[in-house]
Amino acid sequence: MELVCPAGSFPALKAAVDNGADTVYFGFRDATNARHFAGLNFDRRKAEKGIDYARSRGVKVLCAINTFPQPQGWKVWQQAVDMAADLQVNALIGADMGVLGYAAEQHPDLNLHLSVQGSATNYEALNYYKQQFNIKRAVLPRVLSLAQVEHLAKHSPVELEVFAFGSLCIMVEGRCYLSSYLTDESPNTCGACSPAKAVRWEETSRGLESRLNDVLIDRYADGEKAGYPTLCKGRFDVEGNVYHAMEEPTSLNTLDLIPQLESIGISAVKIEGRQRSPAYVAEVVKIWRQALDLAKAQQQSPENFQVKPEWNQGLTDLSEGSTTTIGAYHRSWQ
């Protein structure tokens, strides 16, 4: 399986390439990508530099233009598609039908991948995107069970890519507008669950508080690790009980599922984390490269594949809340 790794900056891109990525994915420094954070992402000059670095080492490069344009901003998304095509990226990762349609019509030689933000959860949707836009691959949402992924793989007309490690989203990607209730912006339109301008951190007598547009999201005791302040992972007072009402901070880790994902025909596994540091990217990619190489070496006897304890420990140390989960892949309900 192909190892697809995050590149939120040029140093992170180098870290991914140097530690074994088969492919890296990046976004431009604007609202056209779903990791639009201050100080991250690429302008044209940095993108050219990153693409040259990756390609000189045999690594493919994908460009994520995976938010949903608003009427007044269509030209920004148009220009992003044109730039990606001009840079000759290996594929464009898109979600919006208008963006995919424009790319397919104006740049027919540009390979298209359906973003996880496209929320394709059944093979009829995959057929539609294949017929209308000739997509080559689809990234599946993180809300599907392994049985559902296997069913899709049997019928899909395109390659499938799944998330393997990183921040876990409990929503069906591309359909979450939760943060817009507080900030008037959402990851689907502006590229960030919690826009930096709305985030505030404050040391108080009760602990470190995180606020989103002045609404208290969480409070951390001394020595407690603070997480990224999103509404879905905040602690709330529910009938007198304060707890993570929607989701506890944790990270997806599917090392144990590598043989199963391989056997059902998954083409690529994706590491989430374009907002993460180069050191984070380097360590995660290194572990996943070792695991995939071991699985490949044992392809004739996949039952012998065993995850090394130090791999899991290394990933746990880098995870949100210092815990990991296999998420929806092994849920008992469908």
Language-model regions, residue ranges each:
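A cross-taxonomic marker for long C-terminal extensions/tails that follow the last structured domain
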Residues: 132-137
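Active-site pocket-lining/capping segments in soluble small-molecule metabolic enzymes
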Residues: 1-120, 139, 147-268, 274-334
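Conserved nucleotide-cofactor-binding alpha/beta core module
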Residues: 122-125
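Contiguous mid-protein beta-loop-alpha structural module that forms a pocket-lining wall or clamp
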Residues: 143
